[in-house]
């Protein structure tokens, strides 16, 4: 009932070189093969140099687990493996850092923060390193690392970033950018967000985060007294900053069973856990997955069916989903606006990375509004890489809600420099200008300054290592508040998704299919792509630009995945059936 996720030495997803080494270890059948695989793995490991002479090296291994009972036993076995690996390498010490029950993105963050703490330590000690005692220097280094890689440091980063992002703007509260935003801004906060935590560790993490908000306000050093046990079905947490209703905790059933973001996104309906089945209706809702790295928003509006009255009248439900595509749109458009207000639109490039599974309505909406996009192969590591390589600020979310916004180091430097320059200019202007002129100039400068501060707060609200559902909830809630408590319905209505259908076809050998153009086109077997193109033109006098279909092999089993998109569900069904038949004909 459990599995293993491995984080690379920088806090990112595991690279292909590591994947190959891990496969060699798992598939080793003899002791000689295992030794060879371990040698291959060791060659790729980054070690922490803990002395100037490089006489000592330490392999640091971070561990975390979710709320499943088997987790504790598996972690202990993994620790044994880490120590054994260190024992076969002379001069290498193994330091175990067990962070207990954490989300997957939290573990990514700890590894990321470890590296940043080491970089900062040696940068700050360049001049004093010659004079310092070596043992004292090493102790000081580990103190810095330990402080940076605790869960309190993680939660504090996100909480402080969010509080900075939503800091009240009294001028906007009174006037707003327009009448609608002005009226919305008078509300203290958004309506409560009901979060389906997939019976997983996200429930525990959200409770700890919420407890910290009050602690930060009180400038206290510990949040233990305000934490609650994460075992109940529902927990309601309301503060001045945010209102969350947490549902589906660790004791409510197996992780992801009939709940979680994957269930909601694929089935287009609310979680079906017995205790919470009806409680999502007419609410603002979100769903995370068991690892707490994916996020989708949804809403279910319920009312009486037209023409029926009385107690026995049936209810008609309208399910609305904001998946990864709409998360990308909201975040990207918000950041574009802030870059424009900050005067940085010409200095910092911004775009969206997506996969072939993104809805065609999404890509057309981006094109219509001048937002640059790039399509990558399926898989979060591929989309992450595309966002990183193509843009200074790359926003990416797979359709399932796994993603984030990546700020390059250069983009962060530009924003920070512009912020310092703007503060300096404001100070000079206020001393040089006359009183009546100063007021006019300060309004212009304040608009720019607020945008720069908003960008800085956004950076801090985001987990810099990987897509993180907790970070994403805070960012989305912050953006909706900054946009005058924007209603879910308005966000959802930015564009209308085209009907889609996804199916699987069993084949003898999935490797006969080769794809290109980010898996949107089929190269082999020869003739299959031509047949798909012909199917898309069936029953149509002219080419229908809303029709789209592609096939790709599964990465783990002998099946071919089929994706079809069309203007209506009936056409979608018809095309899907014909494409499936073509796959069977060409692949078997």
Predicted regions and their residues:
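An N-terminal, well-structured beta->alpha segment
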Residues: 1-81, 86-92, 114-132, 140-193, ...
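Short, highly selective alpha-helical patches that border small-molecule cofactor pockets
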Residues: 71, 75, 79, 203-206, ...
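Conserved phosphate-binding/catalytic loops in two-lobed NTP-binding clefts
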Residues: 90-104, 251
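Short alpha-helix plus adjacent loop in nuclease-associated cores
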Residues: 102-115
């Amino acid at each position: 009932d459990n599995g293993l996720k491995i984080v690379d030495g920088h806090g990112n997803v595991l690279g292909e070189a590591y994947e190959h080494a891990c496969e060699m270890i798992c598939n080793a059948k003899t002791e000689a093969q295992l030794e060879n695989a371990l040698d291959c793995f060791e060659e790729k490991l980054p070690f922490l140099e803990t002395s100037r002479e490089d006489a000592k090296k330490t392999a640091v291994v971070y561990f975390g687990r979710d709320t499943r009972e088997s987790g504790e036993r598996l972690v202990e076995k993994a620790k044994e493996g880490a120590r054994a690996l260190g024992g076969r390498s002379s001069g290498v010490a193994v330091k175990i850092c067990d962070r207990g029950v954490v989300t997957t993105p939290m573990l990514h963050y700890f590894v990321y923060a470890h590296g940043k703490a080491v970089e900062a330590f040696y940068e700050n000690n360049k001049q004093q390193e010659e004079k310092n005692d070596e043992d004292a220097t090493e102790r000081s280094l580990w103190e810095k690392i330990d402080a940076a890689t605790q869960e309190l440091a993680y939660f504090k980063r996100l909480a402080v970033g969010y509080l900075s992002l939503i800091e009240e703007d009294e001028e906007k509260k009174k006037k707003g950018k327009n009448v609608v935003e002005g009226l919305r801004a008078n509300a203290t906060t958004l309506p409560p967000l009901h979060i389906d935590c997939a019976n997983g560790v996200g429930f525990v993490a959200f409770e700890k985060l919420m407890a910290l908000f009050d602690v930060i306000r009180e400038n206290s050093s510990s949040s233990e007294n305000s934490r609650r046990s994460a075992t109940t079905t529902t927990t309601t947490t309301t503060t001045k900053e945010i209102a969350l209703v947490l549902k589906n905790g660790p004791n409510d059933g197996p992780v992801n069973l009939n709940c979680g973001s994957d269930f909601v996104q694929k089935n287009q309906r609310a979680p079906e856990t017995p205790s919470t089945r009806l409680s999502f209706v007419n609410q603002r809702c979100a769903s995370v997955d068991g690892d707490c790295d994916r996020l989708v928003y949804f809403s279910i509006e319920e009312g009486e069916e037209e023409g029926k009255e009385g107690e026995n009248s049936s209810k008609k439900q309208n399910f609305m989903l904001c998946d990864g595509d709409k998360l990308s749109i909201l975040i990207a458009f918000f950041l574009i606006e802030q870059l424009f207000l900050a005067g940085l639109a010409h200095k910092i490039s911004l775009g969206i990375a997506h996969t072939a599974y993104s809805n065609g309505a999404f890509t057309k909406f981006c094109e219509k509004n001048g937002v640059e996009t790039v399509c990558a192969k399926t898989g979060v590591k591929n989309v992450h890489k595309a966002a990183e390589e193509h843009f200074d600020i790359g926003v990416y979310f797979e359709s399932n809600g796994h993603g984030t916004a990546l700020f390059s180091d250069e983009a962060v430097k530009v924003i920070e420099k512009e912020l310092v320059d703007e503060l300096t200019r404001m100070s000079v202007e206020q001393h040089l200008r006359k009183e009546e002129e100063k007021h006019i100039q300060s309004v212009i400068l304040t608009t720019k300054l607020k945008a720069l501060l908003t960008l800085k707060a956004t950076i801090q609200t985001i987990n810099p290592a990987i897509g993180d559902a907790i970070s994403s909830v805070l960012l989305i809630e912050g953006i909706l508040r900054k946009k005058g408590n924007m209603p879910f319905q308005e966000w959802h209505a930015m564009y209308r998704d085209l009907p889609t259908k996804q199916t699987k076809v069993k084949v003898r050998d999935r490797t006969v299919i080769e794809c290109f153009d980010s898996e949107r086109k089929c190269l082999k077997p020869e003739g299959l792509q031509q047949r798909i193109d012909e199917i898309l033109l069936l029953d149509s006098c002219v080419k229908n630009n809303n029709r789209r279909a592609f096939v790709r092999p599964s990465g783990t089993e002998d099946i071919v995945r089929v994706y079809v998109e069309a203007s209506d569900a009936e056409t979608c069904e018809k095309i899907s059936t014909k494409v499936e038949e073509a796959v069977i004909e060409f692949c078997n």
